[in-house]
A protein has these predicted regions:
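Extended oligomerization regions of viral-like shell subunits
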Residues: 62-63, 165, 170-317, 323
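Short helix/loop capping segments that flank catalytic or ligand/cofactor-binding pockets
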Residues: 77-82, 128, 218-221, 283, ...
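Short loop/turn segments at secondary-structure transitions that flank enzyme active sites
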Residues: 73-78, 115-117, 124, 146, ...
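Classical Sec-dependent N-terminal signal peptides that target proteins to the secretory pathway
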Residues: 7-16
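Alpha-helical scaffold segments that mediate packing/assembly in large oligomeric complexes
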Residues: 97-99, 104-108, 113-198, 252, ...
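Protruding loop/beta-arch "assembly-hinge" segments enriched in small, turn-prone residues
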Residues: 5, 22-30, 309-354
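Assembly/oligomerization interface modules of large self-assembling protein complexes
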Residues: 23-116
Length: 354
């Protein structure tokens, strides 16, 4: 009797640390579905689906959740030893040299988690001849690219610790112009006080443009004129046959490429073109992609909270993928614009009435 009670006592003591009963399919059972080399492939190919990553500067991978970036905030000043009308003399040769200073402030890369969930019918999993990964991979890439781009451009679902979105920060610095503000699209973009000039006046050189798809038509409508003032029919913002006669045309603005994301990340009600010194934007990845297979979960719409999938009831599984990444625009001081509130390396071409 005492021996049975003792065994019961031991079981009660050990119960909290005994492994819980697993109601999900462990990772080992789906290794064929997500080979290790594909995890690296995702990280390598996400930039292809993200215009921010394509144009921005990729910093080294982060080893911690936060990385400090020292950013120059005060510039040194040089002084003449013998200024003004004073004639050089023995006394002036012994004059004290003036002091100057430099200063740095810290900006931070804060890595936040980005998740993608792909729901898959179990019937598809049972089909061993079906190349499931070939179907999942492009959708994962697309989802990562859209989410990151919209967070950077517009602050959509962005973590609170991340910097202000590009559009918000550019407008706060006065770096925006609306369609038709100068009376002519050419002047809006390239004229005095136009889109590109706003960035240049802040001490940065524009090296790329991210545009809404509708701007392609507007660009095609701007055509060169001949000596008689008549339009020749040649689009002035297209560099024809950039890669030879068989190559595709490339849209350029002031000699720098314009890209038109097809992933739906650009909201034309907020920006028609985002022009900037893109290497001033840096991003970094905290860790590679991780995976988990969900078998009996309920998937909800994050906005409406309505149930999108009931995996157990609908004979489905869901593959959840996660990665952690960060971005920042250090916006260092320069000689042309020393006021940080007025300085920003991006400008926004906004729709009329915005």
């Amino acid at each position: 009797m005492l021996k049975k009670l003792w065994k019961l006592f031991i079981c009660i003591l050990l119960f909290p640390i005994l492994p819980a009963f697993k109601t999900y399919v462990p990772r080992s059972s789906v290794e064929a579905l997500m080979p290790e080399e594909y995890q690296k492939e995702i990280v390598e190919h996400v930039p292809e689906m993200s215009s921010v990553m394509k144009l921005g500067y990729k910093a080294p991978n982060m080893s911690r959740a936060q990385k400090r970036i020292p950013c120059l905030s005060a510039l040194p000043t040089a002084y003449f030893s013998n200024p003004g009308p004073t004639v050089r003399s023995d006394a002036s040769d012994k004059r004290h040299k003036q002091l100057t200073t430099m200063a740095w402030e810290n900006k931070y890369l804060d890595a936040e988690e980005l998740n993608v969930i792909v729901a898959i019918p179990e019937a598809v999993l049972d089909d061993t001849d079906y190349d499931l990964w070939a179907e999942i991979k492009p959708k994962l890439l697309e989802a990562y690219g859209i989410a990151f781009d919209q967070a950077v451009y517009y602050g959509t679902n962005a973590p609170a610790i991340w910097p202000d979105s590009i559009v918000a920060a550019a407008m706060a610095a006065g770096n925006y112009i609306t369609l038709g503000e100068k009376g002519d699209l050419y002047d809006d973009l390239l004229g005095d006080g136009g889109l590109i000039a706003l960035v240049e006046e802040d001490g940065f050189m524009v090296d790329g443009h991210v545009s809404a798809m509708g701007m392609r038509g507007k660009m095609r409508g701007l055509r060169a004129t001949g000596a008689d003032g008549e339009k020749t029919g040649t689009p002035i913002f297209k560099s024809l046959y950039k890669e030879g006669m068989q190559g595709s045309t490339r849209y350029e603005l002031d000699g720098e490429e314009m890209i038109f994301p097809k992933n739906g990340s650009i909201d034309p009600t907020q920006s028609l073109i985002i022009a900037g010194a893109w290497k001033q934007l840096m991003y970094a990845i905290r860790k590679d992609v991780s995976w988990k297979l969900l078998t009996e979960a309920v998937i909800q719409d994050p906005v409406t909270k309505e149930i999108t999938y009931n995996l157990a009831q609908q004979n489905m599984v869901a593959l959840r993928s996660s990665m952690r990444l960060a971005w920042q625009v250090p916006n260092p001081i320069n000689r042309l614009q020393t006021d940080e509130d007025e300085r920003y390396p991006f400008a926004v071409f906004a729709p009329a009435g915005s």
